[in-house]
Amino acid sequence: MIKLVLVDLDGTLTEDRESTRIDLDAIYAIRLLQKSGIKVSLVSGNSYPILRGLYTYLYLDGGFVAENGCIVFYKEKYRMCRQMEQSLVDEFKSLFKLRDTWQNEYRECDFGFVPAKITDEMINWAKERNLYIKSSGYAVHIAYNPAGKRIGVEKLLQLLGLKKEDVAAIGDSSTDIELFQQVGFKVAVGNADDELKDIADYITSNKSGKGVREFVDKLLKGEFDGIK
C-alpha cells in the first residue's frame, strides 16, 4: 500500500519543463492524496529556502529533500553532504566559463551552473576531486554527494519509518534515476527524459503537472496492479 508519494519539482510539479509556474492540477492532486491519508514529499535539486517555502505554503506533511539529496527536512533540518568550498565553486565556474544559477547564493552543498551541458572535461575535473556531477537539464550540479537524490530519500524514509515498498515517486529528469532506486513504484511524466522512462513502471500520457494529476487519479481509483 502506498503511504507516501515523492514528487520532483521542476518539470514535474510545474506546468512544463520550461516553466517555473506550479500546475494547479498538480496542487489539486496533492490535496487528493492528503485527503486519502497519503503523505506527499518534495524531492528536488532546488535550494533549501525554495523547498521550505513551498513545503509551508502548499501545506505538505511528508518532509522534503533539497539540493539533490544533500539537505533533508522533516521536523528539523539534516545536512547529508559535506559543504562545498567556495574555492572549488569558483574554480569550476572560471575554468569552464559557466555562470551561477540564481539559487547558488542560498545553497550549502550542491551548486548549479549554466549552461546545463556537461563535457568530458567537466566529468574528469569532478572525478579528480571526488565530486558528484550531473546535469538536471536546467543546470550542471556539483557536490560532495556519492549517491544523488538517493542519499536524501534514504534519510527521509528512515525519519518517516517507511519502507521502499510503501513509496511511489514521480519525476521528469535523469537526476530522478537515483530517486527511483529508493521507491517501490516509479512514474515518469510524459515529457520526461528517455532514460527515466526506460526504468519507470508507468509513463503518464500527459506532461509535467498534468501528468501528476493523471497518476494520482489512477492511483486513488486502484488502477495499478499490486498497489493501492
UniProtKB/Swiss-Prot annotation:
Keyword entries, A-Z: Carbohydrate metabolism, Hydrolase, Magnesium, Metal-binding
GO molecular function, one term: phosphoglycolate phosphatase activity
UniProt keyword Glycoprotein, yes or no: no
Keyword Transferase assigned: no
Binding residues annotated for Mg(2+), in chain numbering: D8, D10, D172, D176
Cofactors that this protein relies on: Mg(2+)
Catalytic residues of the enzyme: D8
InterPro entries cross-referenced by the UniProt entry: HAD-like_sf, HAD_sf, PGPase
EC top class named in words: hydrolase
Cellular component, GO annotation: cytosol
Pfam families reported for this sequence: Hydrolase_3
Enzyme Commission no: 3.1.3.18
Catalyzed reactions: 2-phosphoglycolate + H2O = glycolate + phosphate
CDD domains: HAD_Pase (cd07514)
Binding residue positions for substrate: K149
Domain of life, source organism: Archaea
NCBIfam families in alphabetical order: Pglycolate_arch, SPP-subfamily
Function: Catalyzes the dephosphorylation of 2-phosphoglycolate.
Similarity field: Belongs to the archaeal SPP-like hydrolase family.
Name the record gives this protein: Phosphoglycolate phosphatase 1
Species assigned in the record: Saccharolobus solfataricus (strain ATCC 35092 / DSM 1617 / JCM 11322 / P2) (Sulfolobus solfataricus)
Organism taxonomic ancestry: Archaea, Thermoproteota, Thermoprotei, Sulfolobales, Sulfolobaceae
